[in-house]
Regions:
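Contiguous transmembrane helix-bundle modules in multi-pass membrane proteins
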Residues: 1-33, 50-52, 66, 243-251, ...
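Membrane-interface interhelical loops and short amphipathic "cap" helices
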Residues: 1-9, 32-36, 59-93, 145-173, ...
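A generic, lipid-embedded transmembrane alpha helix
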Residues: 45-62, 135, 217-224, 285, ...
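Soluble non-transmembrane domains of integral membrane proteins
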Residues: 509-599
Length: 635
């Protein structure tokens, strides 16, 4: 009975999404405020029924209700309770329900925290978000019902994918979805402004905090996904350029351009057409990501479904969103054309260069992701586009962007002079060059690492200058300024960590017998053997490896080889972490005679990658709570 209530709750949510689209629209059209004001209560009621549905599905997992097909396919009685809870979004149907739940949370948040926005515009925004909810609820109910019953329930369920039986996957998808789905909010703000023809700087100020928060969550989600892949998959890498990784990275690049474009559009009135197209593009790419994950066109550890019918539904929805948005943009584009002159050397130019680089980088990732799919669809052959392409094309595009983020905060709006900038920054360039030269002799002669060190010093020096200037002029430290500083430092930290660990990391695949020692990067790894290891949801082997630095024992590592109920083997690495380096060990197969295949990694500064990602997200959260976003609009 409870399962039927869960299904019926989704039906009610669909009905209320229709009411949310229709009744306030009639109220706005006929100028009946009583109908228009129904948008807020309808948002709350819709969210209530979606939440009830989600709670009931989770209770089905926690109580081992194998009469539900989705539960029987993705859980069993031996699964730990944490993974039973996270199994709710471990496959296609439940992850789509999570998507709808997150969308309802964002919609409620907009209705709750947008009191400064004129009621007519807010009602229109909620109508647009209701229409998006309607599309996904329709998809969920007619192609992906998580409450489908089995006529004859099994005594035991199958199993949650062993890759997902990990704490990282319990938190990574919700954070990623908060970012993915959150891009619907700036999209709805932009569409509402286009429909109303209210395209002044006010709507830009209202849109930017929502764009910042969704971008911050997307950053956290991508960072957690990278961290999970690093320690869980056993291959020691932190980014594989997997097509589904790219599907989350592309909207992140566009959203990065969006938050910068919103800034210049709000302050200077420039790039408004850019801003509108970026808001449309960001959400469209999140829908494209949903299509790639759920259509079956990709095979990946991240994909959920292999049903082309589901993919066609999302593809149709994507075409409606993009097509309708572009038609609306074309209709209102004349209102976005504002003459705003600025010189070649100005902060506007810097932000324009930033956007061009980010969008160019996005298209290189899009090409590398979709090109193999297009060739396969047209029966022109099968190819694989991997890390060599992305590293060769993407990285050179982004290096100028990192340099620019350290220069253009010093450049004045509208017009500046080379002589002023040279005078302001010349001593810093001398100091930075000296430090890079010192690093060349003291640390490494690797050109890529030296470039990364230079970029890190460059950004750090200029952050210090900005702080000193604020202190000297007794200017206020706004949250927006603090956010910019933290996020830009985060990018520098990330770039340094990613470059150093990629260029100076060491990897060895070796055969080790009991008592044997292997020296890597000045550390001695002593293999003490392997013993059987069993838990409720798996059995396998656990290794025993001691790590010494000279005569001092610094770590005891216990890598595992697990075999789950499905028979799927999993390699669980053991890591000795620090901010300076990670020592990473994974065991492979038994080679006979007590010897095992062992993979050892030395990963310098690898933690800086995720530290940088979290700093970027923290900076965005700081910027989103800046005071100017909470000033009530005048009637």
């Amino acid at each position: 009975m409870l399962i039927e209530i869960g299904h019926f709750s989704l039906v009610l949510a669909l009905i209320f999404s229709v009411l949310l689209m229709v009744l306030p629209s009639i109220g706005l059209y006929q100028n009946k405020s009583s109908l228009a004001q129904l948008s807020k209560p309808l948002v709350w009621v819709q969210g209530f029924w979606i939440t009830i549905s989600f709670i009931i599905l989770m209770s089905a997992f926690l109580t081992n209700d194998f009469s539900v097909k989705y539960v029987a396919d993705n859980s069993n009685t031996q699964l730990p309770i944490l993974f039973k809870a996270s199994a709710v979004w471990g496959a296609h149907e439940g992850s789509l329900l999570l998507w709808v739940l997150v969308l309802s949370i964002w919609t409620i948040a907009v209705s709750l925290f947008s009191k400064r926005i004129p009621s007519d515009l807010l009602n229109l925004i909620l109508i647009i978000l209701g229409a998006i909810s309607f599309g996904f609820l329709l998809f969920l109910l007619f192609t992906s019902n998580p409450f489908e019953r089995l006529l004859i329930p099994p005594l035991e369920g199958r199993e949650l994918n062993p890759l997902l039986q990990d704490f990282g996957l319990a938190v990574h998808p919700p954070m990623l979805y908060m970012g993915y789905v959150g891009l619907a909010v700036p999209f709805a703000f932009v569409l509402a402004a286009l429909i109303r023809g209210q395209l002044d700087s006010t709507w830009l100020r209202w849109t930017r905090p929502w764009a910042l928060v969704s971008w911050a969550f997307l950053t956290v989600g991508i960072t957690l996904g990278s961290w999970w892949a690093y320690y869980e998959l056993g291959w020691g890498g932190w980014w594989f350029w997997d097509p589904v990784e790219n599907a989350s990275f592309m909207p992140w690049l566009v959203a990065t351009a969006l938050i910068h474009s919103l800034s210049v559009s709000e302050k200077r009135g420039a790039f408004r057409q850019w801003t509108v197209l970026l808001a449309i593009g960001g959400f469209s790419l999140s829908l494209l990501g949903a299509f790639l994950v759920r259509s079956g066109v990709l095979t990946s550890v991240h994909t959920f479904a292999t049903d082309p019918t589901r993919g066609l539904f999302i593809l149709l929805f994507l075409f409606i969103v993009i097509g309708g948005s572009l038609v609306l943009f074309t209709w209102r584009s004349h209102l976005l054309q504002k003459s705003n002159q600025f010189s070649l050397l100005s902060r506007e130019t810097g932000l324009l260069i930033n956007n061009i680089l980010l969008i160019t980088a996005m298209f290189t990732v899009l090409l590398g992701t979709l090109y193999p799919l297009i060739l396969d669809t047209l029966n022109l052959g099968k190819i694989s586009v991997g890390a060599p392409y992305f590293n060769a094309v993407f990285v050179p595009i982004m290096i100028p962007g990192v340099i620019a983020l350290a220069i253009f905060p010093f450049v004045r709006w509208k017009k500046d002079s080379v002589s002023r900038l040279t005078s302001l920054l010349r001593f810093n360039w001398i100091g930075i060059s000296s430090l890079i030269l010192l690093a060349r002799f003291v640390i490494t002669n690797n050109i890529y690492v030296l470039i990364a060190i230079g970029l890190f010093i460059w950004v750090t020096f200029h952050v210090i200058i900005l702080l000193a200037k604020r202190i000297r002029t007794k200017s206020k430290f706004s949250f927006a300024f603090i956010g910019m500083i933290v996020a830009h430092l985060g990018i520098a930290v990330f770039v340094l960590g990613a470059t150093v660990t990629t260029q100076l990391g060491i990897e060895k695949d070796i055969k080790m017998s009991v008592g044997e020692s292997q020296n890597i990067a000045g550390y001695d790894f002593v293999f003490n053997g392997v013993k059987p290891h069993t838990k409720d949801n798996y059995s396998g082997f656990i290794g025993d490896i001691s790590v010494y630095s000279g005569a001092n024992k610094i770590a005891q590592l216990a890598p595992e080889k697990r075999y789950y109920q499905s028979g799927m083997p999993m390699t669980e690495a053991s890591i000795d972490p620090s901010l300076a380096r990670d020592l990473y060990v994974a065991i492979g197969e038994e080679l006979g005679g007590g010897a095992w295949s062992v993979r050892i990694y030395y990963k310098p500064l690898v933690r800086w990658i995720w530290l940088g990602g979290l700093m970027i997200a923290l900076g965005a959260f700081f910027a989103a709570i800046d005071r100017r976003y909470f000033v009530r609009a005048k009637s």
